[in-house]
Design a protein with these regions (language model features):
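N-terminal Rossmann-fold NAD(P) dinucleotide-binding loop
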Residues: 53
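A Rossmann-like FAD-binding core segment of flavoenzymes
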Residues: 2-11, 23, 27-40, 62-168
Length: 168
């Protein structure tokens, strides 16, 4: 048995996510926790609606971002983050925007300029499987300098199991 945790962040699979100014939430939190000199400036958009996304948004504010907004697929009533965590984030000035999913990240000279969201109509299908449905005609563009993707975590195995008989 090997338990290493899910230390990698997931990307959204949208155009522009490799631009300068885009990081995964866990990558950002790791840099904040390991190096207190991590700073942000300008406007930050956090994509995600779980507790980690709330932590990322609050850390972004503390790292110097002038304005922090969260956007998630879920409506407020099914948002996975703890209600008290969301309330505390809002008390700190973080805006929470429900039922929006990323469509693309707009760039200029390789840097984040804005993120385009599309309205999320539902997150799961009739069988309860993750299968977001969108209104591709209901779009919102949010200007920002930083995008922090906090939409899930992944395992980064690297060479950890190289030379072992452990099967995945």
């Amino acid at each position: 048995y090997v338990a290493i945790g899910a230390q990698g962040g997931r990307k959204a699979g949208v155009p522009g996510e490799d631009a300068d100014g885009v990081k995964t939430g866990v990558e950002f939190l790791r840099s904040v926790n390991l190096d207190e000199s991590t700073k942000l400036s300008g406007r930050t958009v956090v994509v995600g609606g779980g507790n980690v996304a709330v932590d990322v948004a609050r850390a972004a504010l503390r790292a110097g971002s002038g304005e922090v907004s969260m956007f998630c697929l879920e409506s407020r009533d099914i948002m996975p983050a703890a209600k008290d965590e969301v309330a505390e984030a809002e008390e700190e000035g973080i805006s929470v925007n429900n039922s929006w999913g990323p469509k693309e990240i707009l760039t200029e000279n390789g840097k984040v300029k804005a993120i385009v969201f599309k309205k999320c109509l539902s997150v799961k299908d009739a069988d309860g499987r993750f299968n977001p449905q969108y209104d591709e005609n209901d779009l919102m563009t949010v200007e920002c300098e930083n995008v922090l993707l906090s939409i899930g975590q992944s395992i980064v195995w690297g060479d950890l199991l190289k030379g072992t008989k452990v099967e995945i």
